[in-house]
Amino acid sequence: MRFLIVILGMFSTLAATAEETRCGWLENPSPANMWLIDRDGSWDISVQGTSNALDDKSMELLYQATANENEFVRTNRSYGFSCACLTVDVDEEKSSITTIHKSKQLPLKQCLEDISITKDIPLPFK
């Protein structure tokens, strides 16, 4: 019986840290502020003035999702937003992304045509 409880506990831990793919607006409006807005809401990645929980590999993958200047909208000098899919681990309780495993910048058109996030386009004047 104890063995079964231990095994179930191990599987629940694995499920809690399972990778998931989230796609939406990847917003970087100012230094050290970055989040992803998808159909489920806003996911904090980095917030100025708080400790950054992401490792260097995650940060590199994150910036790859904004690398194509033709699919990046500048809203504040070199800051702005793109459309991206990130394969991540999340802390659902804090609505934050804790690790990034993969990233892919998408055409802006893809987010514009996604009715679940079109209204959330991160334009400063809307």
Residue ranges and their predicted role:
Residues 58-126:
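Beta-strand-rich cores of mature extracytoplasmic or soluble domains
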